């Protein structure tokens, strides 16, 4: 290291008077010292103040320029040297060198800038101000078609530099996207897919950029899907495939790219992986099976890509996915159920699947997961059943297949996601199905659980769905027995609270259910309606200008129904409802105006 001190002293003198011969020798000594002990040599270089002199040596004409850039690249491998490089004013001359025609100068300059930018806000900022990114992208564009090893090496360095420049920095990534880096990199990948290092750089760059929403449109306008699938088919190593997966997952969130990936044959690749890995317990294989099946489900989230794979229920992909449901592999059961839930996003598909026995498969799957079951599988299978129950023609078929009995086995679940889907499935099944609604509504165990979940303040979804199912049981059954069961279980107060929901649809469902209670079974419910302050709430809803027309209408229908109770009617009189109702006679909505006239007559006659 004494040698190094001498070299640094000598370098100071020769750098000042630019003695080319001895300068080259000093630079060679420095490179040698850096190769032996980079960190220690870098510290000495920093302490010597030589960095400031390097700025003057970085000139396009000088023969030693590439070596100086090489030294900067080496010292910038150390985190503690990056800010000193910026402070020494090296960025601007380095960026100027990007205009050089000399390939070695370009290579070392790209390395130096890339290393200075690595994890360094100051480095990136300086390169940004000097306009380095655009010059590098222009180089990549012009070099793209060249396949000689030197050009490929240079492109690899430039890709690495752009990656270090923009990594985890949204604004710099957005800048690269606006400079058109994406089409350039996609083209690069297509031409140089045989070059492992360059391919890897492109994939890492895509992985970074694909997270940005603004990148998706640019990606969609290239043939990225085709290139990635082509590359994927060639890969045998787990790590390489994983790198491609990391790009595919964020890209596949875009519907246009989903379709492109399906058309490029990605699904066939994924199905093949599933087949290869399904029986393996090796950690890598289990991880790859999960990634492949998750990605498969993601592709089905796009309407067009989903329909393309469904192929009227005759598609080979759809058939393969069906075979996952009875499998013994939890990951495949989960992916299969989620895939069915996605296929069940339109009525035609739902009807076809129910007619072809999917319900029985899902019920069998749920039966396997009742005791200490897998929560994610329960959730996915219930999601699928809920979606399948939406078309009117499916409801009776699913009810006679015994879906409600299977679903009710999960009433004891303490997992909010499962509770939420269970409630949604039952609500869909009883829609306009009076007999089923009555049967469920008389099930005291179910109603008690609903009342309990109506108080699940920590889980708004479960709370909302419980309220909606309580209301639906009354609305679809119109049964006195159902109302009695709900009164006995303490459900009335929740329906009254539901009438104050911020969602009009829920308010309306509550008011219709309450009107049926008042019309069919007012006596037993009277006390609960009073203590829940129903009359005061109705007054507020009618007086509030923001209430939707249907809310005003159903509130007045309910007021009329409540007149059958002496105590509730007294509350109505005490609150001067006439004033509020008479104002509504001139309401712009005809139904509201008519109901206001009727209600006013009833109030006048009764008083």
Curated annotation (Swiss-Prot):
ARM repeats lie at residues 89-131, 170-211, 347-390, 391-431, 479-519. Keywords: Acetylation, Cytoplasm, Endoplasmic reticulum, Guanine-nucleotide releasing factor, Mitochondrion, Nucleus, Repeat. Residues 122-170 are annotated as: Prevents binding to prenylated RHOA. It comes from Mus musculus. Its main location: cytoplasm. SMART domains: ARM. Serotonylated on Gln residues by TGM2 in response to hypoxia, leading to its inactivation. PROSITE patterns: ARM_REPEAT (PS50176). Interacts with RABL3. Interacts with RHOT1. The keyword rRNA-binding does not apply. It is found in: Cytoplasm, Cytosol; Endoplasmic reticulum; Mitochondrion; Nucleus. GO terms for biological process: angiotensin-activated signaling pathway involved in heart process; CAAX-box protein maturation; cardiac muscle hypertrophy; myosin filament assembly; negative regulation of endoplasmic reticulum calcium ion concentration; positive regulation of mitochondrial calcium ion concentration; protein localization to nucleus; regulation of ERK5 cascade. This is Rap1 GTPase-GDP dissociation stimulator 1. The modification N6-acetyllysine is found at residue 230. GO terms for cellular component: cytosol; endoplasmic reticulum; extracellular space; mitochondrion; nucleus.
